[in-house]
Amino acid sequence: MDDNIEIKREDQTSHALVPDKDRKSRIQHGGKRPIDPFAAEDDDEEEERGDAVDEQDQDDDEDDDEDDDDDDDDEDDDEDDEEDDTARGQRRRAKKQRRNRFLDVEAEVDDDEEDLDEEEEELAREDGFIEEDIPDDTEDVQRRAAADNQRLDRFRRQEEDTNAEALAEELRQRYGRSARYAAQSDYAEVPQRLLMPSVEDPSLWGVPCKPGRERDIVMTLVRKAMAENFTSSPMRIISAFCRDSIPGRVYVEARRADDVVKACNGLAGAYARQTTSLHLIPISEMADLLKLQKVQNEIQVGGWVRIKRGKYAGDLAQVLDVSENGEEVGLKMIPRIDLNPKDSGLYTDSLGRKRKKGAGSSATTVAFRPPQRFFNPEEVQKAYPRDTPTKRGSQWVFQNDSYRDGYLEKDVRVTGIITENVNPTLDEITKFAGESSIEDGINKLGAVDLSLIADASKKATEALIQPKDQVEIFEGEQAGVYGTVKAINNEVITIQLEHEDLMDQIVEVPARSVRKRFKPGDHIKVMSGKHADETGLVVKVEDNVTTFLSDLSMQEVSVFSKDIRQAAEVGSGVNVISGYELHNLVQLDAQTVGIIFNIERESFKVLDQTGQVVTVKPHQISTKKDTSRAFALDHDGNEIRAGDMVKEVAGPFSRLRQGQVLHIYQSMVVFLHNREYTENGGVFIARARSLEPLAPKSVSTKTKKDGGDLSKMNPALSNLSGGGANDVRVEGVRRFGGRDMHKGKNVAIIKGPYKTYRGRITETTGNMARIELTSVSKPITVSLDWLVEKDPITGRSTKLNAGGFGGPSRGGHSGTGSRMGGASSNPYSSGSTSMGAGGRYNPYGGSQPAAAVGSYGGSSGTGAGGYGGYSQPVATSAAGASGYGGTGGIGARTPAYNPYAGDGGKTPAYNPYGDGGKTPAYNPLGDGGKTPAYNAAADGGRTPGYNPYAGDGW
């Protein structure tokens, strides 16, 4: 059909029926519909409407057979019309057919449509799409059901409206305030400004405390405040906190400083005894104390870190890998395995003695941890027979730890490692290069990325670079260019280039791209590290490692270039520790002595008399030995002393070693030094009998050496003396003539700032003396005029004379005679030779600083003398008096001695004319320097001595 048929009912508007397939769908979905309570008013009316619908449906079926080829646009129009009809509340009902309540009569559908599956059918049944069986009840029941449905729908609509209003009100109350602030944010201040402290807020006080106890003090304050909160006198503090970056300080918030002092009273480690010990934090700095700025340290594979705690605390480790979440890192370190499990309850102290661990000690603490040692499965298996290591591929597993190539590989959390200021030393780096010694590991440092070390110690490197340093750019576009540092601004360094093509140009480069530059022949000084303050000559430069020849030990030392700088002076390094110097002979124990050949920061390298090298601490040394007067006999029977150049002529090193004598021990062992030998700092030992001088001693050499001995020029002494024996004696006296006679005296200070202090003279220089005080253990330097000698037993004070060898006594001056031990017979002689102790007393020339020898100028001597001594002959300890004073030299001696024989220098032979310098020989002409020799003519300087002509005050 080409024309549309309009059917208009009384209760609805006009509706166009389209003769297409849409009508079938309407019949399908309208076959059974839910009961409409408003449409059940009149049965007849419903039947009439149903008949009209049926008739119309039959007409539509006929139209469908004829118009199967109509366009789809008509179908869309019909759907719109259907929606309009539904919106107006118009419903069509099919003619009600009689149904049996016990039979399930399905709706009649087209064959073209697919059957609904069970799930869709159930869903449609729940939605009311398929009408269920309705019992044939009365109309009242249906009307009541319809009314109930209406009320239920009305109640649901009211409930939905109410819930929406309540929800809107709740949201308005919750977010209304922030919305107002958000609306005002364009013209109002930042809200965070309201949280800043002001003068009306409580003050913040800094409390000093013991470093390391900050957290304990804060927790104690919190517990104390909670305990006293409900008492009659609660703590009046508001808060307490500490910062890990500020050690030794705890911050307490309170209104008054007295409240802080009261709160901290009784806390161990808190130093808040009074308000003056507190520090008031300014208001502008209060907020900064609560800011937390997390520093992200990027951990690079191959970098260096240190362990924070546990058995490996402080040990250097190399990063192998980093986990994906960045919380754990794989480390490579040198293991610490206890190979003495039986001694697990013991530890070794600094003296090498075993001690028991305390009750609270642990085997993993730093004090009792085993030493670093590379993993050796054989040694571990011997130490732990029940817990042997197992091999898995290239790894060894022992006690749940993995070991590869002798190193321990372990996963550690990032919080347990130190990534800043690691500063690995060259000794530690060489161990990770695959060798345990520095000499062998230096050549393999190529396996270690030393640039990572520079990155790890970046701040230290920048601090060590100073203006005028020679530097080199080693990375970037300008790599290989060098110059002089002109200025440093934070992390930027200004360099004046000295390159051939870029002479005098100024460039700025990052500090991390610059390193110090040295060339062979430069004289450098070590600024930090194990060899600090040591100087030397650069012999080799390889990347970041510089090798120099030490001025102190004459050995090659390798250090990082960042730790050294150029120096003009020749330093001695750490040459003195606790009073011990290089090449000192020290006593280690009752049977062992040794010579120091290397000085480290806190220890010495000592070569003992058996040839063994030991490392000792200063407190392990008993004393320092003085061998300046020691001598020994060489291979030919000649004397050798310290300073002689000798060579070995016997033994395994015959004709191979030579050197200078440093020390002689027990006249048998000789310590020698040769700068050409690198082993043990050039120090070695030898037997005295296996040595001989490099230049053999001849008669002419001896004569030339002893040419200054004036005793050989005296014909009387040379004719009457015994010869060679006296030569040795005279030489011995001359050797002892230059000693410091004040050294070792107990003195008291009578002037100056140290008045009344007592001490002991250690050395004198001119008129100044160096005193070691006994009360404060402090060395000072004072004048000899400010000192008096104190008797340590009686406490008697004696004036200390600056000249001569002894202190003055009553009536004369003390001292020796001539330098050869004999006294001059000239009564008017006023002094001795320049080699003697000083001049003699001359009655016509005034007092002299040395002893007087002769008849006049009374010296306080004891012997009898016709001119200067007693007139009464007195027999002293050896002989009687002669007619002219002095001893006759023969009295009461056994056996008898020829007074004119040439017995000079012999003992017990006594010659009155040739006994000068002998002890206890007595010679009236040469006893000036003998003790207890008594000579009336040469008794000056003896105490007690009495001379009636010397004005001795008695």
UniProtKB/Swiss-Prot annotation:
Keywords: mRNA processing, Nucleus, Repeat, Transcription. Residues 803-820 have a biased composition (Gly residues). Residues 1-125, 696-723, 797-834, 933-954 are annotated as: Disordered. Residues 823-834 have a biased composition (Polar residues). Residues 39-85, 105-125 have a biased composition (Acidic residues). Gene3D superfamilies: 2.30.30.30, NusG, N-terminal domain (3.30.70.940). It comes from the Eukaryota. CDD domains: KOW_Spt5_1, KOW_Spt5_2, KOW_Spt5_3, KOW_Spt5_4, KOW_Spt5_5, NGN_Euk. Residues 1-25 have a biased composition (Basic and acidic residues). The keyword Magnesium does not apply. InterPro entries: KOW, KOW_Spt5_1, KOW_Spt5_2, KOW_Spt5_3, KOW_Spt5_4, KOW_Spt5_5, NGN-domain, NGN-like_dom. Transmembrane segments: none annotated. GO terms for biological process: mRNA processing; regulation of DNA-templated transcription elongation; regulation of transcription by RNA polymerase II; transcription elongation by RNA polymerase II; transcription elongation-coupled chromatin remodeling. Residues 89-100 have a biased composition (Basic residues). PANTHER family: SUPPRESSOR OF TY 5 (PTHR11125), TRANSCRIPTION ELONGATION FACTOR SPT5 (PTHR11125:SF7). Belongs to the SPT5 family. Component of the SPT4-SPT5 complex. Interacts with RNA polymerase II. This is Transcription elongation factor SPT5. One of its GO terms (cellular component) is DSIF complex. It is found in: Nucleus. Pfam families: CTD (PF12815), KOW (PF00467), KOW1_SPT5 (PF23042), KOW2_Spt5 (PF23284), KOW4_SPT5 (PF23291), KOW5_SPT5 (PF23290), KOWx_SPT5 (PF23037), Spt5-NGN (PF03439). Residues 520-545 form the KOW domain. The keyword Repeat applies. It comes from Mycosarcoma maydis. Its main location: nucleus. The SPT4-SPT5 complex mediates both activation and inhibition of transcription elongation, and plays a role in pre-mRNA processing. This complex seems to be important for the stability of the RNA polymerase II elongation machinery on the chromatin template but not for the inherent ability of this machinery to translocate down the gene.
